[in-house]
Amino acid sequence: MSETLNLQIPSPTFEGSTGGWLRAAETEEKYAITWTSPKEQVFEMPTGGAAIMRKGENLLYLARKEQCLALGTQVKTSFKITDYKIYRIFPSGEVQYLHPKDGVFPEKVNPGRIGVGNVSHSIGKNLNPAQIKFTNKSFCD
């Protein structure tokens, strides 16, 4: 799938209601998530209820970016689908590609990305707090 949004992609089959979420999104902005499924399967909607994703490409509109991220995490962990993309759609029709911004998901490392807050050892190599409690040494050193 490319970074441009094809609005002709079919949506998953959903028999419920979004509870009015998308009504407000029509006047402000809405979000779209796309993914490719190897087969038809039932998934849980972030707004509640369940839907059936279609075999092939799927397009789903949601009102909040957090709902798209939650659904993206679900399809990645439960269904092993890793090609999802999230877009912001403004009322004017302008489409902005949001996630993953540089083509790599945030939890992965690519050559151009700088790690922030990384520790160069495993958690098993951490100091025992009881051994350094009354010394001048810090946990972070």
Curated annotation (Swiss-Prot):
It comes from the Eukaryota. One of its GO terms (cellular component) is photosystem I reaction center. SUPFAM superfamilies: Photosystem I subunit PsaD. InterPro entries: PsaD, PsaD_sf. It holds the Pfam family PsaD. It is a peripheral membrane protein. Keywords: Chloroplast, Membrane, Photosynthesis, Photosystem I, Plastid, Thylakoid. One of its GO terms (biological process) is photosynthesis. It is found in: Plastid, Chloroplast thylakoid membrane. PsaD can form complexes with ferredoxin and ferredoxin-oxidoreductase in photosystem I (PS I) reaction center. Belongs to the PsaD family. This is Photosystem I reaction center subunit II. The gene is psaD.
